[in-house]
Amino acid sequence: PKIICCTPAIGERIRSAQDLTHFPLLDTVKSKRLWPDILRHLTVEQAEGDRSIGFDDAASMRRAALQGIGVGLVSVIDAEEDLRSGALVAPLGRDALVDMKPDEVPGFYLVVPRGHLRVKAVAALHRWLSQQDWRSDLRISPLP
């Protein structure tokens, strides 16, 4: 799950989901459809043109959000630290995206040749991933 995050200075200027369209939207290059899906979910009228900035990885995107380059989609686990410290804020609330459809939420895949499942460590990881209930929400601690 993701949380829409930005610096407090940017957050002061975001009063509604529509205000997101006034800022660069930060994401990873592999999740190009994520912002359009989120804006649609939030019923935001999307202007012509792409206001997103893509980064190679989530850590770089998070650093850009921390530097005030735009509004980022930060994983719940990473966002907790930044929200708690006050480095980032969640201008639309921490749970603005919790009711997104499961097929709109980014996932991950374990791709491994079948023969590699004979390796104990790979088999253990595969088994563990398969047994998890990935539908359950990650809960983050309340702010102090």
Region annotations inferred by a language model:
Residues 5-7, 28, 73, 91:
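Generic beta-sheet signal
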Residues 17-18, 44-45, 99-102:
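Short secondary-structure boundary/capping segments
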Residues 46-96:
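Hydrophobic hinge/microswitch elements
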Residues 24-44:
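Secondary-structure junction motif
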